[in-house]
Amino acid sequence: MSQIPETSDIVLIGAGIMSATLGTVLKELEPSLSVTMFETLHDCGQESSQAWNNAGTGHAANCELNYTPQRSDGSVDISKALEVNTEFDISRQLWAHLVGKGAIPDPRAFLHPCPHMSFVWGDDNVAFLRQRHREMAAHHCYHGMEFSEDPAQIAAWAPLIIEGREPGQPIAATRIISGADVDYGALTHLLVKQLQAQSGFSVHYKHRVVALARGADGRWLVTVENVTTYERSTTSARFVFAGAGGGSLDILQKSGIPEGNGYAGFPVSGIWLRCDVDDISARHHAKVYGKAAHGSPPMSVPHLDTRIIGGKRSLLFGPYAGFSSKFLKHGSYADLLRSIEPGNILPMLAVARDDWQLSEYLIGQVLQTSEHQFAALQGFFPRAQREDWQRAVAGQRVQIIKPDPQHTGVLEFGTELLASADKSFVALLGASPGASTAAFIAMEVLQKCFDDRLTPDAWLGRLKQMIPTYGIDLKKDADACRDSRAKTAKVLQLDFV
C-alpha cells in the first residue's frame, strides 16, 4: 500500500461511485492535482455502490412512478422526472468520454441496454398511467415511449408479468427501450483503476477518518486510522469531499462547519428477493416498476428487474424496507445514537412527530412475514415459485433530516450537498436517485466549490469536452438532447429510439 501523503490538494472520503466520479472529473480538468482517497473497507465500491446493494437502474425517470405525482385535477406533474432524466444524460456523457479516450476499455463491463417499463393494474392505476404516458410521450425527453393495455403486447415485452394473471384484470404498461442496467460496483472499480494509473492519485483502503480539523493555514487536517494496525496519519488538504454514503453525516459533524448544524439522518434498510435460475432470468429483459401503495414513501416503489452482474443474468424484486440503526451496511448499530447532537435533537423529534406515515410503513414492513413478501412478488410475477428466490440484503440508505423554520425539522428523500462558506469542504447527504446522477452531482460540486475555475481560460474548455451539453438545458433544447443521446448511445452500446 502506498504511503499516505502529508499534503494533498484534494481528499475524497469514501471510495464509492460518488468519490470515484468526482475524482475522475477533477483529474480530467486538472491532471496536476494531487488527489487522496480514504476508504474504511478493503476495496472500493463495497457499500451502496456494490452491485447487489442497489437496484442498478440507470435512473432516467423513465419508469419510476414516484417521480410523476398525479395532481388533484387528474393531470400528471412530470417536472421532477424531467430533472432526473436529464441529470442521467450527464452521466452518459461522462462515461462516453471515458470510453472514447480508452480510460474505460469496454462499456459492457458495467453497462447493458435494458428496457424500462412501468406496469400497473386496477382501473384507477390504468387511468393514471394512460395520462402519464400522454404527457410524457409529448415531451422530446421521452421520445419513443410506448403504451399498451393489451395483455398480448405487454406479454411480448415482459412475459413473466402476464403469464398466470387473472383474465380480464385491467392492466397497462409503458416501455422505453433506451434504458440501462448499470453495475455501479464494476463502474466504481473501473474509475478508481484509471485514477490509479495517473500520477498524483492514491487510494488508501482500511483507513477510517477519525478527526477533521482546521489548521492555522486554513487547510483541513484529515486524520485517519488504519483499522488493522490502529496507526494514525494526518494529511493536510486544500479541499475535502465527504462522499461516504451513510457515513457522510459523521464526517460533516466532525468538520464542525456551521452549515451542518441541525442536520441528522434517518436510516432505512432494504431487502431484495433474488432469482439466479437461468431459465427464468432469460425470459425477463426489462426493469419493471410498479406503483407504491398510497401513502408509502418513495423508496417503497416495487420493481422486478433484470440484473447483469459479472456477466451473470439474474432477477431482482423489491425493495422491502425495514429499520436498522446502522448508517452503513458494514457500520455499527450505534451509528444512529452516535449521530445525535444537541443541535439536531429537535429536528429529529419533529420528524418523529410529523411523519407518522413513514413510521407506519416501516413498522408494517418489519412485521411482514416471508409469505407477505412473496405475495408482493406474485403481484408482479404470478407464477413465481418460492424455491427459485432467495433473500438478499441491500445497502443502507440514510435519508436527510434537516432543520426547518416552520416545522423545526423535515425529512427529505433526495440528496443534498452541504458546503462550507469558504468552499473548502462539501458533504453529500441523502440517498436518491443516487448513483445514476453521480456525474451531475460532480457538476454541482464544481459549481459550488470551484466556480472560480469554470472560466474559458481555466476548466471550461475541458469540461465541455467531457460534458458537451454543459450549460445547455436539455429539457428545453430538443435538438441538443436528441444529438447527445444518439452519440452517447453509439459509444456506450445502448439502444436509441
Curated annotation (Swiss-Prot):
GO terms for biological process: tricarboxylic acid cycle. The keyword Flavoprotein applies. Coiled coil: none annotated. Signal peptide: none annotated. It holds the Pfam family Mqo. One of its GO terms (molecular function) is 2-hydroxyglutarate dehydrogenase activity. It comes from the Bacteria. SUPFAM superfamilies: FAD/NAD(P)-binding domain. Its cofactor is FAD. HAMAP family: MQO (MF_00212). NCBIfam families: mal_quin_oxido (TIGR01320), PRK05257.1-1 (NF003603), PRK05257.1-4 (NF003605), PRK05257.2-1 (NF003606), PRK05257.2-4 (NF003608), PRK05257.3-2 (NF003611), PRK13339.1 (NF009875). Belongs to the MQO family. This is Probable malate:quinone oxidoreductase. It comes from Rhodopseudomonas palustris (strain TIE-1). The gene is mqo.
